[in-house]
C-alpha cells in the first residue's frame, strides 16, 4: 500500500467521466429526487455540460488536496469553454495528448516533441483524412473535422453506419500508423504516438509525482488508465460496453452523473 502523502497526480478525462451533457446525465430517479446541477460549459449562449453540485464540491476539495489534471480529446478552444469548480488547474492536457497547457498557455516544446514522434511513425494527416473521406458515405456522414492539425474525426448517424465499416477502415489505418475507433457518434482517426498517457507521464516527470490516479470512459482513455497506478472507469461508455478492464482498473457500477461523483470520491480517498 502506498503511504498517504506520496506525491500524486490525478489525471481525469472530462466528457462523460466528470462532466456530462443533459442527454448523458442519466438521471433515473424521480424528478423530485434529482440532484441539483451546476452548469460548467456554455456553447453558443446555451448550457452544454454539467456536474452535480455534490461532484462540484468534491472536485474543489480534490483540487486543493492534489495536483488535478484535466485530460481531454477536446481542442484547446473547446477545453477553454469549460469552467470547472475549485482552483484553476495549473496543468491540462488537450487534443488527446497533443497539447500541454501550463497556467492556460500551451507548451511549444511538447508540441514539437509530439509532432516529431508522429512524423517518424505515421502517414501524414492529409493522406489519412482523404482516405477517410473517400470511404465515407454522405448518407450517414454528418460532419468531418480536423482537430489541432493532429487527428481527424467524423460525426455520423449511427443508425445508418454500415456494420463492419469502422473495422475495415481501422485495418488500413493500422498499416499507416493510425488507430481508428468509434465513440458515440464520432469516428476518430488518431496517430498511434498521440496518447493521453505520454502527456501524463511527462507531467508526472515535471511535477515529481510518484503515483498516478486516473479515470476515463472511452477507448481513447484506455492507455491513460493503463499508465496509472490506480484507475476507475464508469459503468457507461465504450470501455464498459466492451467489458474492458485491467488489474489496476476498477469498473464502477454507477453511470452518468452518479459515476462522476463516485470517481471523485475514489480520487479523494486515494490521495
Residues covered by each model-derived region:
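Active-site neighborhood of HAD-like aspartate-dependent phosphohydrolases
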Residues: 2-70, 80
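A general structural motif
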Residues: 5-7, 65, 89, 149, ...
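Short glycine-/acidic-enriched loop or helix-start segments at secondary-structure transitions
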Residues: 21-22, 79-82, 103-104, 223-224, ...
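Mg2+-dependent phosphoryl-transfer enzymes with acidic/Ser/Thr/Gly-rich catalytic loops
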Residues: 26, 190, 197-271
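Active-site phosphate-binding/coordination module
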Residues: 49-133
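Conserved acidic, metal-coordinating active-site core of Asp-based
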Residues: 129-213, 218-227
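Proline-centered loop/turn at the N-terminus of a beta-strand
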Residues: 9, 67-68, 91, 179, ...
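Glycine-rich, phosphate-binding/catalytic loops in enzymes
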Residues: 26-30, 86-88, 231
Amino acid at each position: 500500500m502506498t503511504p498517504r502523502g506520496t506525491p500524486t497526480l490525478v489525471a481525469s478525462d472530462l466528457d462523460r467521466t466528470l462532466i456530462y451533457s443533459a442527454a448523458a446525465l442519466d438521471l433515473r430517479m424521480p424528478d423530485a429526487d434529482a440532484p441539483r446541477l451546476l452548469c460548467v460549459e456554455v456553447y453558443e449562449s446555451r448550457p452544454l455540460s454539467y456536474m452535480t453540485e455534490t461532484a462540484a464540491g468534491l472536485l474543489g476539495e480534490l483540487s486543493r488536496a492534489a495536483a488535478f489534471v484535466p485530460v481531454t480529446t477536446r481542442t484547446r478552444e473547446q477545453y477553454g469553454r469549460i469552467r470547472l469548480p475549485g482552483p484553476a488547474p495549473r496543468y491540462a492536457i488537450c487534443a488527446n495528448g497533443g497539447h500541454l497547457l501550463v497556467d492556460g498557455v500551451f507548451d511549444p516544446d511538447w508540441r514539437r516533441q509530439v509532432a516529431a514522434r508522429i512524423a517518424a511513425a505515421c502517414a501524414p494527416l492529409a493522406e489519412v483524412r482523404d482516405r477517410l473521406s473517400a470511404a465515407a458515405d454522405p448518407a450517414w456522414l454528418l460532419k468531418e473535422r480536423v482537430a489541432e492539425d493532429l487527428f481527424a474525426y467524423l460525426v455520423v448517424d449511427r443508425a445508418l453506419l454500415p456494420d463492419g465499416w469502422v473495422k475495415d477502415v481501422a485495418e488500413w489505418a493500422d498499416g499507416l500508423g493510425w488507430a481508428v475507433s468509434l465513440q458515440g457518434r464520432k469516428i476518430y482517426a488518431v496517430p498511434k504516438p498521440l496518447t493521453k498517457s505520454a502527456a501524463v507521464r511527462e507531467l508526472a516527470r515535471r511535477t515529481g509525482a510518484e503515483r498516478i490516479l486516473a479515470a476515463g470512459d472511452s477507448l481513447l482513455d484506455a492507455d491513460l488508465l493503463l499508465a496509472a497506478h490506480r484507475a476507475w472507469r464508469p459503468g457507461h461508455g465504450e470501455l464498459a460496453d466492451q467489458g474492458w478492464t485491467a488489474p489496476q482498473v476498477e469498473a464502477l457500477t454507477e453511470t452518468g452523473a452518479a459515476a462522476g461523483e463516485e470517481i471523485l470520491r475514489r480520487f479523494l480517498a486515494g490521495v
